[in-house]
């Protein structure tokens, strides 16, 4: 594989996973508010509303189980990055007084026709 090609394929896989996750959430009647919010300290893949609760969603996608289950990639360090981005998002929107939670959607695409989606609600607490 040429240099850089792996990261390109990983980016495509990540976008595919985020699209699958957004569609999954919409089927559950979540309302997608924002996607791929980035700030200096981190990134949030999806910001959605589940009723009156604001949900910050981290999406992890894998093509194989060889690297372990996708949700294990949401390490304490990654949780801190997501938390920083969520606080930045809330601050910019003037929404620091809303109910919010952090979910993880783990997607394994062993076959293009049958991705496995696991949704973990309240996956972690706000981390500093």
UniProtKB/Swiss-Prot annotation:
Top-level taxon: Bacteria
A GO term, aspect molecular function: nucleic acid binding
InterPro entries hit by this protein: Restrct_endonuc-II-like (IPR011335), tRNA_endonuc-like_dom_sf (IPR011856), UPF0102_YraN-like (IPR003509)
Pfam families in UniProt: UPF0102
CDD domains per UniProt: PoNe_Nuclease
Signal peptide residues on this chain, from the entry's feature table: none
Family: Belongs to the UPF0102 family.
Name by which UniProt lists this protein: UPF0102 protein GSU0650
UniProt source species: Geobacter sulfurreducens (strain ATCC 51573 / DSM 12127 / PCA)
């Amino acid at each position: 594989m040429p240099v850089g090609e792996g990261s390109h394929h990983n980016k495509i896989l990540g976008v595919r996973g985020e699209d699958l996750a957004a569609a999954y959430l919409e089927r559950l009647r979540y309302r997608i508010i924002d996607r791929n919010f980035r700030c200096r300290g981190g990134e949030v893949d999806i910001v959605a509303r589940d009723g009156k609760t604001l949900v910050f969603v981290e999406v992890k996608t894998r093509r194989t189980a060889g690297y372990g289950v996708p949700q294990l990639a949401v390490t304490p360090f990654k949780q801190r990055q997501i938390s920083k981005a969520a606080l930045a998002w809330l601050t910019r929107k003037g929404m620091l007084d809303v109910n919010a939670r952090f979910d993880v959607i783990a997607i394994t695409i062993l076959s293009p026709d049958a991705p496995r989606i696991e949704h973990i609600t309240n996956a972690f607490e706000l981390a500093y």
